[in-house]
Each structure stands twice: as structure tokens, then as C-alpha cells.
Amino acid sequence: MRCELSDICVYRNERISTNALNSHTYVSTENMLPDKGGITDAASLPTVSQTSKFIYGDTLVSNIRPYFKKIWFAEYDGGCSNDVLVFSAKEGVDPKYLYYVLANDSFFAYSTATSKGTKMPRGDKTSIMQYQIEKVDSPTQKKIAAILSALDEKIAINREINENLERQAASIFAGWLNTCTDFSTIGDMAHNILDYSPVASEQIRLLNSSDVTEGVFPVVPLVPNKDLKGHFKKRFKFGDILYSEIRPRNHHYGFVLFDASDYIASTRLMVIRAIENKVSPAMLYQYLLLPEVEAEFTLKTESRSGTFPQGNYADMASIRVPYSPTDSQVAISETLTQIRYTIAQNQLESQRLAELRDTLLPKLMSGEIDVSAVQL
């Protein structure tokens, strides 16, 4: 038997004072990660006095460009922008089960198909509540949620490990910087790569400036190598660093530790490559993560007018940083490189777990996989 989404949940329509929020408890479409990646801390808070409220157990879904699949299960109370939908489970409905109903790719496909607008499509709130699902009893809801949660918990553990490794890398690098006896600029250590050579293969992977966030790359599908949008031109390779020219506060950057031979990136992503006798790729990436580097690049970028403040490589290249010659970098470079490889491996494992979860999810929701024998 089937039912509508409105039978198991409602939109939460409460408000909360912006003064009660901080960068951790405020959620907007900009700090929600694509492909069901959860959230990061917000770069800024809204200027309005009140915003939408959510509580622990709600499910938040970005209503702009639903195909980005931005969704988060609220782990605490907070507030969100009006472009984020807040779903609250009805009495008798398992909140985590509701989350997985909404995390199903078929829901995002439906939301995209019924969305309104072309340049910035938004999901239609009325149509969304008419989304058809299988009617599932409470015990089965809990079993489905438990199976899928086990995979998400492992993904969360990997994320926590990587966050710890990032802190270690930053601490180690800060200690080395304190021993530096000279200064250099980013431009003296790196090249701005402008490789627009065509990819010969019939299928390619396209990477937009907002697709990579804080070093996490999405699973990028293969698409036909034809009729590409004009901004998809740049080539990059293993060991390069990608850094968005737009809104650096949003942290759209990443260290490429995979074969990128079939990738094409947006021209809004700088491709930064370490100069071999000046710095290793892992060291250069750590330089670009320095708060003072981000702050200076952001200041230069946001001093320009426009809807989307945009910097350029010249802005980055002129930034001065502490420096010592390569012979003093050997030990720390090896350590940072190993940390980066470990982080990349954890990310890869999480991607595979997410693929397994997304394969199981529709089969569990439809009843194709029988969970009656599962013991909780």
C-alpha cells in the first residue's frame, strides 16, 4: 500500500531569533554539502532578526537545485535559511526513517522534476508533500533506519578521523612555520595552470567550483564529451590543488590525489601546482589552508563589486608567508604527505560506503529486501 509524504511528516514553520544562533547552529544552502554530505559551519549569519527553526530529529533539505542532494539529519536544535525545508516526523513515525525516505535518490529526482524555475530551480512545497512512498509499519521503519544508520555511522567515524588528522596537520605545520627564517610568496612556490587541452575520450567528468568543499571531492559521474558549457575548460592532474576564485569563505578547495585524466574543471577553479624545488604539493596545500592566507585572499576578493565576489590567481600569488628552503622541509613534508594520503583513503572508503547505502536504500524502502528477520 502506498501513501503520500504528507502522511508521515509536516513542514516545521516555527521561527528562532538570529541572536540565539552561531556558525555551528545556523544552516543555509551554502554550508550544506552536496551528495548527502551533511553540513559544515556557516561562513556568516543572516542579517534578519529571525529565521526558520529546526530541532533535534528534524530533516533539513536544501530547496534550491534539488539535484545537488543536500540533506542533513538534525543532531541538535538551531535555525536555517528560508531556502532550507525543515521536515518534522509525525507521531508514530521514526525520525531517522523519515530522513532516509528523503535521502532516497528517487525523492531528489521527483523534487527536481516538479521544481519551478530554470536558472535557480526550487522544489515546489505542495508537490513535495505529494511524493508517493510505500506505507511501512513502525517496527519495519526502525529496522530500515538501523541498517542504513550503521553505514552512515562508519562514514561519520571516517569524517571525525579526518577532522582530527586535519588538526594534526595544521599543528605540525604551524610548528614548522615558527622555525622559518625567511619569507616567500605563494606565487614564488606555485604555478597557475591554464591547461585547456581537450580530453580525447568520449566520456568525461565535470567538476564545478562548488563541487569540492574543504578537501572533499564528490563522486563525479561520466557524461558525454560534447555540448559542454563554456566554463568547463580546465585540465588538472594528480598532485594539483583546486581553489575556487568565488567566495573563498565557502572553502571550495581540494588536494587532488586521484587520476584526473578524464576530468574537466570549471574556469572558476584555480589549478595551483607546486614548483618542485620550492615546496612539495602537500606543503603548498597546507600553506593555502592557513587562516591568514584565506583572510587576505578573501579581503582582496570581497573588495570587488558584483553578485559573486571573484578573485584571481594574482591575488593569491602576492600573499607573503614564512618560508625556509626545501632541505628543511623534508621531514615535515613526508609527514604531511602521509596525512593527506590517509585522509584521501578514508574519503574513498566513505564514498564506497555511501554507494552501498544508496544502493540498499531504495530496495529497503520498496520492500524488495525483506527485513522481517532483522533483530534490533
Where in the sequence are the language-model features?
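Amphipathic heptad-repeat alpha-helical coiled-coil/stalk segments that mediate oligomerization
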Residues: 375-376
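A short glycine-rich beta-alpha junction/loop motif
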Residues: 79-83, 116-145, 263-268, 303-330
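Feature representing long, continuous alpha-helical segments
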Residues: 282-286, 291, 295, 330, ...
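Sequence-specific dsDNA recognition surfaces
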Residues: 4-56, 187-244, 250-257, 265
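Non-catalytic DNA-recognition/assembly elements of restriction-modification systems
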Residues: 1-16, 32, 130, 134-199, ...
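Well-ordered mid-protein domain cores that form the structural environment of catalytic cofactors
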Residues: 104-112, 134
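A short beta-sheet element
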Residues: 50-52, 56-105, 233-234, 238-294, ...
